[in-house]
Each structure stands twice: as structure tokens, then as C-alpha cells.
Amino acid sequence: MAARQQQKGTGFGVQYEDFVPKSEWKDQPEATILNIDLTGFAKEQMKVTYVHSSKMIRVTGERPLANRKWNRFNEVFTVPQNCLVDKIHGSFKNNVLTITMPKETITKVAYLPETSRTEAAALEKAAKLEEKRLLEESRRKEKEEEEAKQMKKQLLEEKEALIRKLQEEAKAKEEAEMRKLQEEAKANEEAAAKKLQEEIEAKEKLEERKLEERRLEERKLEDMKLAEEAKLKKIQERKSVDESGEKEKILKPEVVYTKSGHVATPKPESGSGLKSGFGGVGEVVKLAEEKLGNLVEKEKKMGKGIMEKIRRKEITSEEKKLMMNVGVAALVIFALGAYVSYTFCSSSSSSSSSSPSSSSSSTKPE
């Protein structure tokens, strides 16, 4: 038989090369001998099996080649009818596998007539045809089994690939969701931090504005207090000046010219008139001063507490009223002082203008 080769892959990167080894039958009187040429194979790389159901001998083997390739064969041979199955034996020598199949009846081919030889040749030909048919059927079955196995393997690989793809998609989806949740959590955290920072800044600005307002209020109150103290001091100074001028005017003697000379006499009428004229104003000024003094003393006693309450914005309506009264009293005293000063000045000027006329009338000679 001529050898033929065929390449097959398994999907794992290993390739098999199938081939049909050369075989030769020899018919001897004692036995039928089958020689198979297996060059390149070792004894351990082949296997011979007798199949009782089909009365056939199966010879298989495989050996590795280079680049992940394997060389293999699978041959089936029909056992002759008059063969002793229990005595079949084989040997491997010089790359040739020899299978000896002893016969039940020893034939002497040399002494057979011509007709017997023809029948033997026909039988041998029929046996070879049957062997060929069985071999082809066996190969067809093996091919079908191999295709079924390959199809099953392919389906299994496709199933595994599909499962692997689904797992990868699920993992990618899970990672995307996890990444999205992390980004959302980070964004929420940043937004919360930003909002908290804005609230802190707004609170600080509010505190600064309140503090500035308190400072302005304290400054205004301090300015008001200083202004009131200055007004009070000015009123007191004017009062002292007015009182000294009034006393000097009351005690100043009036000069009366007579024949004997001029005589200085006091003028009680002027004093009484001045007293009667300015008595009401003096009493009002005195009452205003007493009230202002009481309010100032009370403010001095409570001043520290009021200023502290103003800073804290805890001042009561009564304390506000007290501060307003202090301001009003100061203004009243200032107005009364101005009025008194104006009145005294007017009185002084009128008295001065009337003195020369009286003196001229009194110095008229008799």
C-alpha cells in the first residue's frame, strides 16, 4: 500500500499527521504472516489489539515530531478464517512489525491442483476486498467519531468562550458602576465640602459685619458721650461766667451827683428787678443741672454695663430712654445757658446806656 498523509488540528496548537503504513501479506503452509513497515516508530509507540467481535487486528501508534506536530496511524486487518486466534503473536525488528497468525489446518500449496490454487487466489482476493471494505468502514466510523468529538469540543469551547465573555462583560459593567458610584460619592463629598466652606465664609463675613457694626455703634456712642461731656463742660463754664457777671452787676454801686458832690449808693431795685426778671430762668437752669447731674451720676454708675450691653446688643428700652434723657438734658442746659448769656448781655448794654443820662440830669446846677 502507498502511504498517504493528512494534517489535523485540535485547537490546542498541536497538529497530527495521519498516514497509512505499507503492509504485505505472506501465505505460508503453517501460518499467514502480515508485515507492516513502521520506519521511525519505536516499539513503545505502537499498539496491536485483536477485536473478537469483528475478528480483526487493529494496529495503532503515534510519535512526536518537531514544532508541536505528531505522526500517527490507525490500521485494521482481517484475520483469515482458518487462523488460530489464541496463537497470534507478533515481533518488531528492523522497523518492521511482523504479525504471525498460525493456521488450524496446515495446507501444502505445492501439491494442490490448479483448480485449488485458483480457488485459493479467489478466496485471497475476496478476503482482501473484505478487508478493504472493513478498513474503509472502520475509517469512516473513526472519522465520524472524530468529527463528532471535534464538534463537541468546538461547542464546548464556544460555550466556554461565551461564558468567559459574559463574565468579562459583567465584570466590566460592575467596574463601571463601581467607578460611577465612586465618582458620584467624590462629587457629593466635594459639593458638601464646598457648601460647608461657603457657609463658614458666609458666617465669618456675617461675624465681621456684626463686629464692624458693633465697633461703629461703640464709636458713635463714644462720640456722643464725648460731645455731651464737652457740651456740659461748656455750659458749666458759661454758667460760672454768667454768675460772676451777675454778682458784679448787682454789687456795682450807682453814682448819684448832688450839689455837694457825687455819692455812691447801691441800687436794690435793679437787683430785685434782675432777680425777679431772671428768677424763673435760674430755677429752670438749676433744675436742669440737677437732673443732668443725677443722670450723669447714674450713667457713670451704669456706664460700663451699658457700653458692654451695647457691644452685645443687650441694651434695654429703659437704658435707651435714660441715654436719650441725658442728651435732651444737655441740650436744654446748653439752650438755657445761651439764653441767659444773651439776656445778661442785653441787660448790661441797656444799663450802660442809661447811666450817663441820669448823671447828666443830676448834675444840673441850682
Swiss-Prot record:
Bias (Low complexity): 346-366
**Start and stop residues of the A- repeats:** 129-133, 135-139, 156-160, 206-210, 211-215, 216-220
Where it sits in the cell: the answer is: Cell membrane
Pfam families under this entry? HSP20
Region described as 3 X 14 AA repeats B of [IMA]-[RK]-K-L-Q-E-E-A-K-A-K-E-[EK]-[LA]: spans on this chain: 163-206
User: Is-annotated flag, keyword DNA-binding?
Assistant: no
B- repeats sit at 163-176, 178-191, 193-205
Outline the extent of the sHSP domain: 14-121
Q: How does it sit in the membrane?
A: Single-pass membrane protein
Q: What does this protein do?
A: Seems to not be involved in heat resistance. Unable to mediate restriction of long-distance movement of the pathogenic tobacco etch virus (TEV) without causing a hypersensitive response or inducing systemic acquired resistance.
Which PANTHER family does the annotation name?
A: HEAT SHOCK PROTEIN 26, PROTEIN RESTRICTED TEV MOVEMENT 2
The family classification in the record reads:
Belongs to the small heat shock protein (HSP20) family.
Q: What is this protein called?
A: Inactive protein RESTRICTED TEV MOVEMENT 2
